[in-house]
Structure formats: C-alpha cells, structure tokens
UniProtKB/Swiss-Prot annotation:
GO molecular function, one term: clathrin adaptor activity
Intracellular or extracellular location(s): Cell membrane; Membrane, Coated pit
GO BP: clathrin-dependent endocytosis; protein transport; vesicle-mediated transport
Organism superkingdom: Eukaryota
Complex and partners: Adaptor protein complex 2 (AP-2) is a heterotetramer composed of two large adaptins (alpha-type subunit APL3 and beta-type subunit APL1), a medium chain (mu-type subunit APM4) and a small adaptin (sigma-type subunit APS2).
Protein name: AP-2 complex subunit sigma
Annotated source species: Neurospora crassa (strain ATCC 24698 / 74-OR23-1A / CBS 708.71 / DSM 1257 / FGSC 987)
Role summary: Component of the adaptor complexes which link clathrin to receptors in coated vesicles. Clathrin-associated protein complexes are believed to interact with the cytoplasmic tails of membrane proteins, leading to their selection and concentration.
Family membership noted in the UniProt record: Belongs to the adaptor complexes small subunit family.
Gene field: aps-2
SUPFAM superfamilies assigned: SNARE-like (SSF64356)
Alphabetically ordered keywords of this record: Cell membrane, Coated pit, Endocytosis, Membrane, Protein transport, Transport
Major site of localization recorded for this protein: membrane
Length: 143
C-alpha cells in the first residue's frame, strides 16, 4: 500500500503531495526533506530506483527535472509501482500534451484528479490509459 506520493523538482520544491496515511504537518515537512535528500543525489545510470526508507521503500523515477516518488510497504511489488508511476506520467503527457512542471503548478487540481483516477486509497486503481482519459474528458465537460 502507498503511504504517500510526492512530486518534487531538483531544488526540492514539492509540486504535488498526496498522503494516504495520516501524518502531522511537522512530519510531512520532515518527510519531504528526507525524501528529496535521499533521491536527488542518486546516479540514474548506476543506482536502482528503489531505496529503503525507514520501514518502507521509496520507488522513484526522474522525468526531466521532476522526481516522482512513491513510498510503499516493504512487501509490495516495487516494479508494479514503478510502472504505475510511468503510467501516471504517460496519462499526464496525453492529457496536457507534453507535460511540464508549470502544468503541475497551474493545473494542480487536474493533476490531483488524474492521480485519484490512477490510485485509490493507496492502491493502484486503474491501468488502462484510455479508461482514465475518457473519465477525465467527462470531468472536463462538467467544468
């Protein structure tokens, strides 16, 4: 199960945070800093995308200047979550048309809607890009 999902840039600014386990505000701030210090200096070519973190694992993937991080239980399948992160980015790309950091900042409510279509209550909910994009089209029509 997911504990949280963070999207951070190279400077450590959090662009999106979704918490599936209750944390205090102080703990959230501390976790954001720890996660960034953990994944930012890692070498993409020679180190894996999985990092042990407290009693969990952090599964992360870097796209351009953004780190997409998911904190999962130690007994969960890391590769499934790595693919789920990639799937989430593919949906963002399709929805926004070559997504960038500014899309996440200025359309954060849409990004949260996309995230909620892919993950539900800390579990992977949907794996079909077409189904997610169709649901998002229906949501866009309501606005």
């Amino acid at each position: 199960m997911l504990s949280f999902i963070l999207i951070q840039n190279r400077q450590g600014k959090t662009r999106l945070a979704k918490w599936y386990v209750p944390y205090s505000d102080e703990e959230k701030i501390k976790l954001k800093g720890e996660i960034h210090r953990l994944v930012a200096p890692r070498d993409q070519k020679y180190q894996s995308n999985f990092v042990e973190f407290r009693n969990h694992k952090v599964v992360y993937r870097r796209y351009a200047g953004l780190f997409f991080c998911a904190c999962v239980d130690t007994n969960d399948n890391e590769l499934a979550y790595l693919e789920a992160i990639h799937f989430f980015v593919e949906v963002l790309d399709s929805f926004f048309g070559n997504v960038c950091e500014l899309d996440l900042v200025f359309n954060f409510y849409k990004v949260y809607a996309i995230l909620d279509e892919v993950f539900l209550a800390g579990e992977i909910e949907e794996t079909s890009k077409q189904v997610v994009l169709t649901r998002l089209e229906h949501l866009d029509k309501l606005e």
